[in-house]
Structure formats: C-alpha cells, structure tokens
C-alpha cells in the first residue's frame, strides 16, 4: 500500500513537472541573429536579461531564445536630411530650426559650416 502511494505521488509530481515545463516552453520564442560573435550578449541586448543566446557550432549561427512578448522595441523611424537655405546673422540656428520644423514633418534644423558658408541642414522622419 505504501509503495503504491509513493508511486502515485511520484506520477502526480512528474505530470506537474511536465506541465510546468510545457507552459514555459510554450512561451519561448526563437530568433536567428546572425554569427556567433558575442551571441549571448547580443541576444540579451535585443530581448532582455531573460534571453539566452546559443551558438550552433556547425553552422556558426546564433539563435536567441527569449520569452515571447518581450521582443525588440519597434524600429525607430528612418532619418532623412534636407536643406533650408543659408544660415546668417539674420537667420541663425534658431531661425534654421524653425524653418526646418515648418518645411518638414517633425523636422529640426542646425547650422553647419562648410568652408566659408554656413548651411541650414534639416533632419526629419522619412
């Protein structure tokens, strides 16, 4: 009777352990992130401290295992550059910035000297 009870407890414990393991594995996502150089460090930088990078020695590829839902942040918008004329005593850095803000969506401007000429350069989201 005591052996049967021990066996039942062991079976229940094994089922519980397998169930927990499946739940953990079900929430793990995988991403290939290139070569093996600093695999674990790059994986953690991309997906947080719970992520684990593993290198496939045969193919020299890094695979990142991380908890699903904790992926990389959305990509930042691409930056484009344009011009808004010449910077001068009459239109300096503040004027340049205002011109770029009016000319481009979410634009900002700065004066950049090239030789004897100071150009108003704009940076904005493409």
Swiss-Prot record:
InterPro entries: LCR. GO terms for cellular component: extracellular region. Keywords: Antimicrobial, Disulfide bond, Fungicide, Plant defense, Secreted, Signal. It is found in: Secreted. GO terms for biological process: defense response to fungus; killing of cells of another organism. The keyword Disulfide bond applies. Disulfide bonds join 29-68, 36-55, 39-62, 43-64, 80-126, 91-111, 96-120, 100-122. The keyword Ligase does not apply. Belongs to the DEFL family. This is Defensin-like protein 183. The gene is LCR19.
